[in-house]
Amino acid sequence: VKKYITWYLNKLNRTNINPHTGQPEIIGSVYDYYGDTETTHGTYDSVDSYAATFLEIVMELAKLSEENKNWLQEKKDDISLVASAMINTIDTESFSIPTDFTSDDNDYLSIAKLDYPVKYLMDNCEVNMGLKAALWLKDNGLIDNAVDFSTFLAQNTASVKALYNGTVFRWNKGANGTGTPDLSKFYADAVCQLYPGLFQVIEPDSEIANKVYTQFNRNFGSWASGTTYDDYPWTIIAYAAATINDVTRVETYVKHIYSYNSKGQQKDRWYSAEAGSLLLAIDRIQNPIV
């Protein structure tokens, strides 16, 4: 984990202009790097989620020991820069977002990135987690950003919850009410419904979390037996199932994956995030949060 944190901080973008495209850049963001030579085209999937999930990693490492906390203290300035990248994707009174896809209405929802300013439900659930981490990190002296993370968190939580229309969550907050999901469409419409409970924007055992999880499984319940509905395995579904204590489906999926592992094989497109999400699911089932 320390190696990854060091690598990530060494890759931070430290100027407000993208050297590859000449376009505006968010300081503290990180590009995608490829292969052993770590080449980049100056692009990323998002700024908001990358920063948010990184802050969560930092918090979890700091909680393990005082030694880890002291190690991170030495990197306080750079970690604060990552927090600022997340902050600078969030639509607030002091930050005007591009309005290509949505309104600048100070709702404390994040956009994915400057050149694709969409307020995604999935990203904002991750950002909500990142704001919780940032609040903890600031309280523990590991970042020094001059913002009130409690306000950011409360406002972001309220706006994510407001994307629920009584039946489903909108998968993005587009202009003029766009973003209403088609639940027969796996990505992003259906699978995004699992994210508010998974990232605890709403309680995982709440009526809404159970309702959207049940709806998801009506159309895509065969995930547990190994059916894929996308190019990737999406093991994060198993993690969502674990947070709602669906032991049967999680155990069925784990047996499916073990059927590959026992033969020294892997499921197609089995990347680190897929393995990590499944390990989190197993851990949650074995150590349920009471």
Give the location of each predicted region:
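Extended ligand-binding clefts on enzyme/binding-domain cores
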Residues: 17-18, 39, 43-49, 73-77, ...
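Alpha-helical solenoid scaffolds that mediate protein-protein interactions
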Residues: 1-4, 8-11, 15, 61, ...
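Short glycine/serine- and small hydrophobic-enriched flexible loop segments
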Residues: 56-63, 129-140, 198-201, 239-243, ...
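Aromatic-rich carbohydrate-recognition surfaces in CAZymes
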Residues: 1-90, 121-124, 250, 254, ...
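CBM-like carbohydrate-recognition segments
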Residues: 13-37, 43, 183-188, 197-290
